[in-house]
């Protein structure tokens, strides 16, 4: 029995011992082969022993390895001035905003002020670098947070002013010699006569250029000069370039008081040899800033073809050439410009000087219209009159083809005249457009009526029938015979009086089968100022825009064996100052076309369909009788004065 028990223990030991050996091998880094090591472990073979060891940055027995979070504790990483970011088996140091990682130095501060594109400071601000960031500081005299800076008026450095810059209009200290508007009006010259200009919209820095002068007058200017009532002049001398911006008083002369009104302005002398002025609107109207015409001279660049450039005491100036001298007034070279709204006559200043006119007093029939100096290709003495009957003593003369405006230019070398009074007559002729063809025809088919405005003057309105779309060939005789394929060209014209304010408007134009303009059978061509849209042959060329109105339509006949067509147009003188005269026909009409004022109706006809004989003598007689109709329009007193 004892031997059997010993044998049992021996067998048990033989079976259990290998099991303990295998189990012990699995609990240590030793392995039977390297494939049993973890992916992040290193396998070492030492004879018969295989050892697994976790790599740096990992922890475990080699068979199992886990990542070590170096960022979890401060002593396991070296990111003292940066941000630690754990990675698999290691870590990285990421610099904070405003810092840059440098090998061996870690994170160091970035200077945003020296590296392009890193700061967003305003262009005028100063960038100040700080640890990990920066700040922006506006310059002295500016307000803002540094990202936006704007100057404060009165705080700019000497010689600069707070002015808007670019499209944004930001206020920036700038040199007004580089930022100004240019005033080129020749009428600002103290030589120019009276007018009604007022500088009520002046605000900012300006430079005077052109023939009127390049700087303000420094002495009291007589009233009714510079195209204004009360001329404004600089009460004080102009500054030198080293003085920078100076303040001066601008005075206005009126009622025998050279400084009845005044305003403060600023002046600066610029390096280019010119002045700029910080002007403000005058205290009253009509006041305007005046220039000294003698200030135009100064550089040889301005010399004309009739002048030489000479040096006088170190200053270059223009001097008249001897070749252009004349010995008789009749040889004076002149320049006459006939513009749409004004007439200008100019005389050679050099030739006037050669005749002894060191000073030139030039005026028209109305002495209020005086001459002025004007420099261009040549040096001229010029004078201007409106192309109208009345102003400056201008007289209108009219014939069948042209309207002619005439005046007389007077020349003197002194204010008073004792010996010779030099007079130069001049005139400009203007063609009368559509009216020419009517007045040159022997017997045009035309209807006319007279319109009086407040009893101050008469306007004549005519209506005529033309053969062509240019309205230059009127039909002649008491009647017209046309086929239904032909086109009628109808023109109405306003003649006489001052046409600068009123335009001709056709309010209703229609056709009837009889000469009676009140015939109940009417075919409207224009109704309530607008054309009949259903008739595509109607073309309104002009209406409510000028002194004439025109339309065309294809010939037609009335139903019911009626071969005669009569045209009738109700016309109206529209005041452009207070009314909308040009029709707008896309929407609501102006008024009902049922009522037509027969005292304002022009009549034409008869127009007979070709191939039909008709007695028209009675109709023509009736039509000619209409020429004596006068239409009275009662307007307000203000309008009457304007027309008068």
UniProtKB/Swiss-Prot annotation:
A lipid is attached at residue 615 (GPI-anchor amidated serine). Glycans are attached at residues 40, 78, 235, 278, 325, 399, 450, 516. Residues 589-592 are annotated as: Essential for cleavage by HPN. GO terms for biological process: antibacterial innate immune response; apoptotic process; apoptotic signaling pathway; autophagy; calcium ion homeostasis; cellular response to stress; cellular response to unfolded protein; chaperone-mediated protein folding. GO terms for molecular function: calcium ion binding; IgG binding. Residues 175-294 are annotated as: D10C. The keyword Cell division does not apply. InterPro entries: EGF-like_Ca-bd_dom, EGF-like_dom, EGF-type_Asp/Asn_hydroxyl_site, EGF_Ca-bd_CS, EGF_dom, Growth_fac_rcpt_cys_sf, NOTCH1_EGF-like, ZP-C. GO terms for cellular component: apical part of cell; apical plasma membrane; basolateral plasma membrane; cell surface; ciliary membrane; cilium; endoplasmic reticulum; extracellular space. Residues 151-174 are annotated as: Beta hairpin. Expression restricted to the thick ascending limb of the loop of Henle (TALH). Residues 337-592 form the ZP domain. Residues 457-592 are annotated as: ZP-C. Gene3D superfamilies: Laminin, Zona pellucida, ZP-C domain, Zona pellucida, ZP-N domain. It comes from the Eukaryota. Residues 457-467 are annotated as: Internal hydrophobic patch (IHP). The ZP domain mediates polymerization, leading to the formation of long filaments. The core of the filament consists of interlocked ZP domains which assemble into a helical structure. Each ZP domain consists of an N-terminal (ZP-N) and C-terminal (ZP-C) region connected by a flexible linker; the linker allows the ZP domain to wrap around the ZP-C subdomain of the preceding subunit. The heavily glycosylated N-terminal part of the protein (containing several EGF-like domains) forms branches which protrude from the core and are involved in pathogen capture. This is Uromodulin. It comes from Rattus norvegicus. The gene is Umod.
